Amino acid sequence: MGSNEVATGDPLATLDWNKGEGLLPVIVQDADNLRVLMLGYMNAQALAVTQQRGEVTFFSRSKQRLWTKGESSGNVLRVVSIQTDCDADTLLVQARPHGPTCHLGRTSCFPSAPGQFLGSLDALVAERERERPHGSYTTKLFEQGIRRIAQKVGEEGVETALAGVVQDDDALLGESADLLYHLIVLLRARGLGLGDAAALLESRHQ
């Protein structure tokens, strides 16, 4: 999906604008790691502008006008999808942030939750795959190709298993961390992410 293409669907046509006197709360989530980035409000015009431009645009309750996130700082939020909740009175926008979302220079306006680091690491690996910064170990792996990455996953998997067999907990944790990292790189080398694997696990659980 291009930056100006927003997946909306029919549910947006039945939004309940009356509950909030013409405003709907909007949760913005990182499309790659699913971290909640911020909360804002949209009126119908802000939603239309967001759909048209592909950049998250809110209605400012204090300034009483539309404002596009990042219009001053350049830290815009590129829209990937827009969904509504079951009551059609709240929006969930998945976006890709270009720079920090919080005005304090933080990634999110909310503190990190335990276990959220893996999602952030997945997003970082995806960024490394796109930008290939010089001197990065991750860049080196991508440039060596899928066979080398797969080999590293195999090596780390064996080392993790051996650490478990000998009951060396410190080694087990260290090797598990290495395995997770290289597995993320392998997934990204195939155009996949941790979210895809997690979604499959979730479908099996249901």
Curated annotation (Swiss-Prot):
A molecular function GO annotation: phosphoribosyl-ATP diphosphatase activity
Region (Phosphoribosyl-ATP pyrophosphohydrolase): 118-206
Catalytic activity entry: 1-(5-phospho-beta-D-ribosyl)-ATP + H2O = 1-(5-phospho-beta-D-ribosyl)-5'-AMP + diphosphate + H(+); 1-(5-phospho-beta-D-ribosyl)-5'-AMP + H2O = 1-(5-phospho-beta-D-ribosyl)-5-[(5-phospho-beta-D-ribosylamino)methylideneamino]imidazole-4-carboxamide
CDD domains with a match to the protein in the record: NTP-PPase_HisIE_like
Superkingdom: Bacteria
Pathway participation: Amino-acid biosynthesis; L-histidine biosynthesis; L-histidine from 5-phospho-alpha-D-ribose 1-diphosphate: step 2/9; Amino-acid biosynthesis; L-histidine biosynthesis; L-histidine from 5-phospho-alpha-D-ribose 1-diphosphate: step 3/9
Positions of region (Phosphoribosyl-AMP cyclohydrolase): 1-117
Protein's cellular compartments: Cytoplasm
E.C. number: 3.5.4.19, 3.6.1.31
PANTHER family recorded: HISTIDINE BIOSYNTHESIS BIFUNCTIONAL PROTEIN (PTHR42945), HISTIDINE BIOSYNTHESIS BIFUNCTIONAL PROTEIN HISIE (PTHR42945:SF9)
Name used for this protein in its record: Histidine biosynthesis bifunctional protein HisIE
